[in-house]
Amino acid sequence: NDKVSLGNQPTGVPGLDTLLGGGLSEFSFNLIAGAPGTGKTTLAHQIMFALAGPHKKALFFTVLGEPPLKMLRYQQQYSFFDIDKVGSCIRYVNLAENLRTGDFSGVLERISKEVESFAPGLVFVDSFRSVIQTARSGNEGISDLQHFVQELGTRMTSWQATTFLIGEYAPAEAEAN
């Protein structure tokens, strides 16, 4: 039998695995999207803290203007938050400065370098919408963004990690896309 068997990976979020038919496919590429303030980042953190451990590390890239420290302070209010995992099996990387220059290839290289050095089983990119807005207003245009998305998708699937893109969308935009 030459078929590769990919298992279902429970999310660790009460009730979510039932909705997903048992969990997420291992090494899957996932999108967490919704309107502002709907809990996308909190859901991502709940999954990350439930699954991350010594044998499955997590890398959380943030491209938001706020520093990871501010986000960590907010997430600490939840019972799933475990400060002992931060640094050892969960690492935060702020890409805001890389993105500010508008150089998508530089952002890709930074992401790849961090993934290669930390070898995570889980990768999160929050917020993907910030990358799109940079394409619309910066030096690089929509075709550069499309190349970035394709290249990021290709690299993410080759990392043998379950990956998540987190995107903020207004309801009208979500329906249009």
Name each model-derived stretch.
Residues S5-G7:
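Short boundary/hinge segments that flank catalytic cores
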Residues T11-G23:
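Pre-Walker A adenine-sensing motif
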Residues N30, A35-L99:
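Conserved P-loop
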Residues N30, R100-N177:
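P-loop NTPase motor core
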